[in-house]
Regions:
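Membrane-interface helix caps and helix-loop-helix hairpins in membrane proteins
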Residues: 145, 169-181
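N-terminal signal-anchor transmembrane alpha helix
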Residues: 54-85, 237
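Hydrophobic cores of alpha-helical transmembrane segments in multi-pass inner/ER membrane proteins
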Residues: 128-134, 186-204, 233-234
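Juxtamembrane boundary at the C-terminal end of a transmembrane helix
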Residues: 236-248
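Membrane-interfacial, low-structure loops and terminal tails that flank and connect transmembrane helices
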Residues: 27-56, 204-222
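Membrane-interface loop-to-helix entry segments
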Residues: 104-132, 179-191
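Hydrophobic alpha-helical transmembrane segments
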Residues: 120-145, 160, 164
């Protein structure tokens, strides 16, 4: 004689399953709503198209700027070593009292990171940072779509490099009272690098999730005007402060 065991849902077990099913349904609905909202956002504010907004152009520009920046960093590192060994010898980029790499290299601003009695030229960290940016550019040229956290960290890292370059420029203009040509090259390279990476972060990597205003900004080409004004403003400030001394 066989015994058949029947399983019946008690009111308590059935009630316990209802919230789980409702939770899963709510999560599914929220995901669908997010996708629908994102699709509606793209339809209302489509992402810009064309070669200027694609990965090939943007990451190529980013790569070229990063290469220029790392070359400048290597030269600055070599100059720092040479100055340490030959403190009384002028560098090749010491053109006059105003355009003087030696004056900038011997300032405390050129070595802001210190560990005890040891100090390291900022150019060493520039080499490390630019190596990372070159890697990002190569991956971007390979059509890699980064995780959102990585794309955000890359942009924030480039922003930090840009802010440091502008801080050093302000110190050179108003505190050190001397300009380093390789530092100027590094500053302009970092600026172009940041412009390209910001553009790629929006149009290629899709960050932020709802870039309505940014999509319109790039689609209308407003970034071109802003970038040109940006570069011209930097040149104007340098010439206004030290123009006469630079060409003396």
């Amino acid at each position: 004689m066989s015994h058949h065991r029947s399983t019946a849902l008690t009111p308590s077990s059935a009630a316990s399953k209802i919230p789980v099913e409702e939770s899963r349904t709510a999560e599914s609905d929220s995901d669908e709503d997010w996708v629908e909202d994102d699709a509606a956002s793209l339809e209302e504010h489509p992402m810009p198209t064309g070669w200027r907004h694609r990965a090939t152009w943007l990451y190529l520009l980013h790569l070229l700027a990063s290469l220029a920046a790392i070359i400048a960093s290597f030269i600055l590192s070599a100059d720092a070593l040479y100055s340490a060994r030959h403190p009384d010898v002028l560098l090749d980029c010491d053109l006059n009292a105003k355009v003087s790499c030696s004056t900038v290299a011997q300032s405390w601003q050129a070595e802001i990171i210190k560990l005890g009695n040891l100090s390291f030229p900022n150019a060493y960290f520039g080499i490390a940072a630019e190596s990372v940016f070159i890697t990002i550019a190569v991956l971007g040229l390979s059509r890699v779509i980064f995780p959102r956290w990585f794309a955000l960290c890359a942009w924030l890292g480039n922003l930090a490099a840009l802010l440091y370059a502008y801080w050093l420029l302000s110190q050179s203009l108003f505190v050190i009272n001397a300009l380093c040509p390789w530092c100027i090259l590094l500053m302009f390279s970092t600026t172009i690098q940041f412009m390209a990476l910001s553009h790629a972060t929006v149009t290629v990597q899709g960050l932020p999730s709802h870039p309505r205003k940014l999509a319109t900004y790039y689609r209308l080409g407003a970034d071109l005007l802003v970038d040109v004004v940006w570069i011209v403003a930097i040149v104007a400030v340098i010439l206004a402060v030290d123009g006469s001394a630079i060409f003396s």
